[in-house]
């Protein structure tokens, strides 16, 4: 039952994305197609293509495409992502933002919606000619048109990847940047290629208005641009481009979380270093204490020191010194002090105040020798 519920939930989500993308693409292209038809119909009586528009037409068409995309992306990005473009869908699939199955649903929705939008504009606006098809301007070769569409699409797709796919503090205004990027590309593209940047935009218009022999450039050009934009995006992500500009893209909450994470790591490293240092200090003190005691006895084994008065084992009451809750004798292992920390690892002689000494085998030996010399007649 759980598996079936998960499968049904996935299908439901794909259907919602399909529906949102269909409606969003339809509205985007309906107003874009309609605006282009309006701009061309007022100045030309019988054109079959959009070719060599004057500056007013160019600005009008670029603005209607840019604003229509901005508004509808802002509406539908919460539902389906607001892609409205098969080239954008493929780019997001390549970088891993949209899954392959979801991409198929969205791709189909975009193509079907483009046909529906073109049919709606054709049927609702007066006139018998489709004036919103994409076509190459006179003198523009097919190769030129192909690469122009590629570069126009790179601009649009890379804007989407950096503003929408990358989650930063300015993601909520990404639709503005996306619409502006389309507007910029249309300012140049409308005059030379019709400014498709979108296979669905070109396909829907030509289904209603008739296909041209070079229609394929409006598929291949944008797809090439999408792949190149996605590839460049992957390269800079691999190179960790975020480190170049520091934390300027982080919100206040993200900066606080990052600072807290750094502080925790720093504290953890400090604790590990302190513990390792205390452990090593305890071992060194233990070995130094044993070596110093051995050095006070000569090689003959008679118990007399090489350059000091004879060593006499101090009485039991002089072998002890205060230490927290227990009494530690001379032959006790000093290495265990490493686990007590700086507070519990205090070693002193009976004659000295506790706050003057810390754990030190060398100091203990010096004090013990001084006491023995003082007691030797």
From Swiss-Prot:
Species this protein is from: Botryotinia fuckeliana (strain B05.10) (Noble rot fungus)
Gene name of this polypeptide: AQP2
Cytoplasmic side: 1-14, 78-87, 166-171, 237-377
UniProt comment concerning the protein's domains: Aquaporins contain two tandem repeats each containing three membrane-spanning domains and a pore-forming loop with the signature motif Asn-Pro-Ala (NPA).
Topological category with respect to the lipid bilayer: Multi-pass membrane protein
Null allele phenotype: Leads to a slight reduction in the vegetative growth rate and a significant increase in conidiation.
Reactions catalysed, as given in the entry: H2O(in) = H2O(out); glycerol(in) = glycerol(out)
Glycan-linked positions: 40
Protein name from the UniProt record: Aquaporin-2
Ranges spanned by the short sequence motif NPA 1, renumbered to the chain: 85-87
